[in-house]
Amino acid sequence: MFIKVNTKYFIDQYALQAQNQKLRSRSWFKLQSIDRLDKLLKQGMTVIDLGSTPGGWSSYVIKQISNLGTIVSCDILPMKKIAGVKFLQGDCSNINFLNEIDLKIKHKRAQVVLSDMSPNTTGISTVDVCKSIYLGKIALNMCCRFLAPGGSFLVKIFQGDGFDQYLYNLKCLFHKVKVRKPSSSRSHSREVYIVSKDFKYKRINI
């Protein structure tokens, strides 16, 4: 016997849990799921969180790295303050903004770069995928600037034209690359999360 699952109801459980736990967003559960599987975050780490607003990932990260670590969160939109999180509002493709990030991490390298950046979707899949890949390239370029050798990178990407090439680029730069689809993601969504570990450290532009 087959049981039909009400997808909307299922997804709403994450929104309800987020509300009950007073979390910024249900994206918190996506990062939690991936982190439990891939063990990305540890106490004392330096982390850069791209596309951080409204703060779901940042609030999860600060709990994992504790006050011994450093997290710099970035978004083009404003974000309400989170204790222990250094927030910068600006465009990650702007060189002056990258210099601000460099100052916040005190010219050190991060052990983890996270990107939950997402484009303003149009409903036209080819356009939305193209925009997502573009944001993914910006995030990957930031890895080449800020990520320490052996570091990890987690990025949200829409599957479609250009995805395979992006995945290939990651495999050239990291020793371990895996594609994840957290249960809290909508099953019909094109979004996936790529976990890349053990950065080879190459200063290049993708």
Curated annotation (Swiss-Prot):
Transmembrane segments: none annotated. GO terms for molecular function: rRNA (uridine-2'-O-)-methyltransferase activity. S-adenosyl-L-methionine binds at G55, W57, D75, D91, D116. It is found in: Cytoplasm. Its EC number is 2.1.1.166. Pfam families: FtsJ. The active site is at K156 (proton acceptor). InterPro entries: RNA_methyltr_RlmE (IPR050082), RNA_MeTrfase_FtsJ_dom (IPR002877), rRNA-MeTfrase_E (IPR015507), SAM-dependent_MTases_sf (IPR029063). GO terms for cellular component: cytoplasm. Gene3D superfamilies: Vaccinia Virus protein VP39. The keyword S-adenosyl-L-methionine applies. Its main location: cytoplasm. It catalyses: uridine(2552) in 23S rRNA + S-adenosyl-L-methionine = 2'-O-methyluridine(2552) in 23S rRNA + S-adenosyl-L-homocysteine + H(+). Keywords: Cytoplasm, Methyltransferase, rRNA processing, S-adenosyl-L-methionine, Transferase. Belongs to the class I-like SAM-binding methyltransferase superfamily. RNA methyltransferase RlmE family. PANTHER family: RIBOSOMAL RNA METHYLTRANSFERASE (PTHR10920), RRNA METHYLTRANSFERASE 2, MITOCHONDRIAL (PTHR10920:SF18). Specifically methylates the uridine in position 2552 of 23S rRNA at the 2'-O position of the ribose in the fully assembled 50S ribosomal subunit. This is Ribosomal RNA large subunit methyltransferase E.
